C-alpha cells in the first residue's frame, strides 16, 4: 500500500478483453482523463483505503463506459461521475461492514492513509481514529458525514449524491457527528 499512485496506470483497459478498442478520443477516455483524479480523491476520502479506492475508480469508469454516451448534457458528466462514485462507495461500505461482522475481514490500520494528509502526529492519530469510528457506522451516515466534513461538500450536494432529501442528509450527518464527538470528545 505504501506510496501507491491514486490514478490508474495508463495501461488500464477500460474496454473488456476481447472487445475492440474504440480508440483514443472517445467520450470515455475524455471523461477518464478529465475526472479520474477527482473520482480517485473522493473514493479515497470516503473509503479510507488505497486499494479499495483504486478498485472503485476502475468500477466507476467501467460503469461510465456503458452510460456516458446516454447523457444528454456533456456538462453533467462530472456530477454524474460523482454520484456514481458515491453510490459504488456506499455499496462497498455496506459489504465491508458485513464482512467485518461475519469475521471475514478484520479491522484496518488507517495510520498510512492518515499520515499522507496530516500536518502533525496528533492530527494523524485523530484522523486514523475518525476512520475507525466511521467503520463502525452505517454506510449512509458515514457517507454523508465524509462528503460533508472530509470532502467539504455543500449540504445540497451531499443530499443529491446520497439520493436523499436535504433533511435526511442533515440528520445522517448530525447522527455521525454525535457518535464521533461521543467517542473522541471533539471534531
Per-region residue spans from a language model:
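Internal acidic/polar
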Residues: 8-14, 99-127, 131
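Sigma70-family region 2
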Residues: 20-22, 61-77, 95-97
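C-terminal flanking helix
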Residues: 36, 40, 61, 138, ...
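A short, charge-rich alpha-helical start-of-domain segment used by transcription regulators
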Residues: 8, 17-41, 51-54, 65, ...
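Arg/Lys-rich amphipathic alpha helix in sigma70-family domain 2
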Residues: 69-72, 83-104, 123
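Structural recognition of an alpha-helix C-terminal capping motif at a helix-to-coil junction
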Residues: 41, 55-62, 66, 75-87
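A short pre-motif secondary-structure segment
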Residues: 144-148
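DNA-recognition helix of helix-turn-helix
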Residues: 86, 90, 156, 162-187
Amino acid at each position: 500500500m505504501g506510496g501507491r499512485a491514486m490514478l490508474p496506470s495508463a495501461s488500464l483497459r477500460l474496454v473488456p478483453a476481447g472487445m475492440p478498442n474504440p480508440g483514443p478520443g472517445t467520450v470515455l477516455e475524455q471523461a477518464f482523463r478529465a475526472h479520474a483524479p477527482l473520482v480517485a480523491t473522493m473514493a479515497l476520502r470516503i473509503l479510507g483505503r488505497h486499494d479499495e479506492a483504486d478498485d472503485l475508480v476502475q468500477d466507476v469508469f467501467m460503469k461510465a463506459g456503458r452510460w456516458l454516451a446516454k447523457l444528454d448534457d456533456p456538462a453533467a458528466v462530472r456530477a454524474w461521475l460523482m454520484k456514481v462514485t458515491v453510490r459504488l462507495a456506499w455499496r462497498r461500505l455496506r459489504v465491508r461492514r458485513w464482512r467485518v461482522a461475519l469475521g471475514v475481514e478484520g479491522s484496518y490500520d488507517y495510520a498510512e492513509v492518515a499520515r499522507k494528509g496530516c500536518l502533525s502526529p496528533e492530527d494523524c492519530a485523530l484522523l486514523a481514529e475518525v476512520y475507525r469510528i466511521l467503520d463502525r457506522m452505517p454506510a449512509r451516515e458515514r457517507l454523508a458525514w465524509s462528503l460533508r466534513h472530509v470532502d467539504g461538500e455543500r449540504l445540497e450536494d451531499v443530499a443529491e449524491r446520497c439520493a436523499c432529501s436535504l433533511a435526511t442528509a442533515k440528520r445522517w450527518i448530525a447522527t455521525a457527528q454525535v457518535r464521533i464527538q461521543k467517542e473522541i470528545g471533539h471534531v
